[in-house]
Amino acid sequence: MSQPVFPTASGIFLPDLHHDEVSAPQLVMLANVVVSAEASASEYSTEGKQMMELQTVACSSYSDSEEDDDAVVRYSMDTSEDLYTQQASHIQPEPVLEEIEIVRVGRPPNQTESTENAASAEQKRTTLAILESSRKKKKPFFCKPCQYQGENEQEFIVHIRTHGTKKMLVVNGGDSDEDLSADAGPQTSVPNAESAESNSKGVIRCERCGYNTNRFDHYMAHLKHHTKEGEDQRVFKCTICAYTTISQYHWKKHLRNHFPSKLFTCSQCSYFSDRKNNYIQHIRTHAGERPFQCIYCEYSSSQKTHLTRHMRTHSGERPFKCDNCSYLAANQHEVTRHARQVHNGPKPLSCPYCQYKTADRSNFKKHVELHVNPRQFLCPVCKYAASKKCNLQYHIKSRHPGCKDISMDVSKVRLRVKRSDGDDASPNKLTAEQAKIMEELEDAGPINLSIKKPSKLNAVVETEKSSKKNMDGKANQPQPNEKKSSSKNDPKEKTAKKLKGKTAVKDTEETQTEDTRVNNKKETKKAVKSAEKALKSRQKKEKPVKDSSVQQQSDDCEQTQHTPQQNETQENRPEKENRSLTEIANAKDCGKVQTKKPCKKQTKTLKVCGETQNVEEEEIMRQKAGKRKAENPAEPKQRIKRTKKKKDSGKPTTSEANQTNPEVMESESSEANNASKPDDSIDESQNPPVAESRPDVEPPTVSDCPIEKAPAVEDVQRPLEAEISTAAPDAPEVDSGNEMPSPTDSDGAPGFTPTLPLQHKPTDAEDDEGIHSNDGGSDISDSASEGSYDSGLMAGAEKLPETPTEERDASAARLLSHTCIFCDRSFALEMDYRKHLNRHLVNVYYLEGAAQGGK
């Protein structure tokens, strides 16, 4: 069964007053309703099926409040124009008096009729005296029941009280029992007042007709309906909402909001519209088409309205004027904003930094942005200053289109002056945060988000920084030059050329005796280092077997195992050999002094464990690393490692003969620290004693373990290798760009140390606002920037994206802003947008069901 839809509830817009205290415009409305109550019940059969048209009420007293659904306000179909014009003709006073008499005769007989007869006689005499003058000239305060004309509002109020509010209500309702009960007292106005409060739309209320809204500009536009006088002036009213207008075009346009005939939906986003032209304009934003071009400059737009607004910048035309003052503007929205802020409009938005208040949300955002990010981008042509680079670009393109050679000087710009609490943290806090990030990365597996392919030289620089953090306990913040070099493509090649030049100069200074001596030591050092790492990895794995945490320590062994392999692959290159030759001479003295203390400790561990098991552990660890590298063949870096590892796998025989030479191993660790940076050799000579002091504590605790437990450890580790290889991701992907400084540093520090340029983008002036810049002059920037103080609204204090995926998500979130096609409000969240849209379309399905049921 279809549910009939009736007009808006009776008494919605009636004020909370006693019946005897109704204001003069309301009484005029009630008196006029008596005159127009001639409609039969047949005229209301199709009332709930579509939009109706409100019949004109004389003397500019337009009403949005209706009594019961009969004999209140007559409606006619929009299509019946001829019938409407006949009904809107002038009404003769004689039938009015007859109707009033007929209605009053039908009242209950318990009331005295003497007063009514006297009142009717008085009305007839007044009608005969004023009939001719009323036809020629009518004053605003005109009483239709008795044809009384008041000079001002006060006289009219005094006169209208003579009729009595109760009599007017009885005349409206006839003999119905409900209206008779309404005559009993003022309690009947309370339910209407409650319904008015519950159904009210806003806080601003029209005193004449009860129209209410929460927007001051809508209220000012509504008052224009009352200023246009005349009986032939029609008022069109929406039966679903409180919309009223005097324009039939706008009334039909509003009707389409409730009854969309066809919806055009965008396949790329959630936009939809019932207007094909709006849909075509929206599709152009996705395709990048800008067919509307300016004839005076290079400006182009996807919408004709934007081009029309742009042309006013060339002509200087300001056609929109404020109704209350002499303010002129090029756009209507500027006049609306001016009326809100200047002419008694509510200002609910207040700035938290100063006493600024406004009603415009866009201006509020721009004002707060000036506190956080002041205007530092200055126009070189005029005195305009912008808070963002994209706004200055749009300003130059729109205001100075002829100046093509303008270059923006952003060298002195310092953006993001007021940062959040996380950005203002001290270096020690940054170190703690980075340590947490590194632990999370180790647990979750390696993630490489960088687009560029890191070279070996960049890896050496990163290991130098990580070694300093591990030895000193403090994070050395990179200089701005290092930040810029990490964000560009060329610095890696430049550093390689510089290092080659330095090594070439230093090679000429070295003698042939040093070259031959170092080359002989190098072959022995590699074998000793690989054997020593295998021994330490076995000793580290014995503890997790006892503590039931084998998997975590196996990851640490993975990182320590790949370190000598990276050193071997790196030393095989001729460039690395030339560089290491020059650095050994500088670190020679330091290495000899530092290798005396750990010699005894290392010899003890070698005696306890034995040479045969060292060879077995070395083979096991190499097989495990080979399996894990074979798991991910997609990375080209890991393929290179695999091939180089196979070449070096045939050297375990030399490691057996040279295991008892700890001095060579310690000098190799000092070379690894010094070979990473040639210029910092002095600093490296001071740091190794701190790093080398760690083996004094750890190896004695592990060396007490008996030899008989080694086969049991091997039996436990072999099934664990299959589990780790399938469950854990490949760790060498992270370590490919970072080499560990020494064999013992892996115990005290995490294996993966991301540098600061990976966590925060450099605050370069050219790249700071690349997300917000619109080189093509987008439509959003057009509509927001023209005639306003600043066009960037939504990007006030956003942080720069830290990763490429975050940047992609941020750009996608901006594209998904939803704009209501009915009231042009924008919503960032789709959920809020859907809720708002349901308010417009809440009665569509009910009305369609009613229309189908009526057929």
UniProtKB/Swiss-Prot annotation:
The record lists the organism as Danio rerio (Zebrafish)
- The UniProt gene name for this protein comes to rest
Alphabetized UniProt keyword annotations: Cytoplasm, Metal-binding, Nucleus, Repeat, Repressor, Transcription, Transcription regulation, Zinc, Zinc-finger
Protein name per Swiss-Prot or TrEMBL: RE1-silencing transcription factor
Presence of the UniProt keyword Kinase in the record: no
Spell out the molecular function terms from Gene Ontology: zinc ion binding
Q: Where is this region: Disordered?
A: 172-199, 458-811
Q: Enumerate the subcellular locations listed in this protein's record, separating them with semicolons.
A: Nucleus; Cytoplasm
Q: What is known of its domains?
A: The C2H2-type zinc finger 5 is required for nuclear localization.
Q: Where is the composition biased (Basic and acidic residues)?
A: 462-472, 481-496, 504-535, 570-580, 628-638, 711-721, 799-811
Keyword match Repressor: yes
Q: Which GO terms describe its biological process?
A: branchiomotor neuron axon guidance; facial nerve morphogenesis; facial nucleus development; locomotory behavior; motor neuron migration; negative regulation of DNA-templated transcription; negative regulation of gene expression; negative regulation of neuron maturation
Signal peptide bounds? none
Q: Where are the zinc fingers (C2H2-type)?
A: 141-163, 204-226, 236-258, 264-286, 292-314, 320-343, 349-371, 377-400, 818-840
Function (record text) = Transcriptional repressor which binds neuron-restrictive silencer element (NRSE) and represses neuronal gene transcription in non-neuronal cells.
> Quick one: where is this thing mainly located?
nucleus
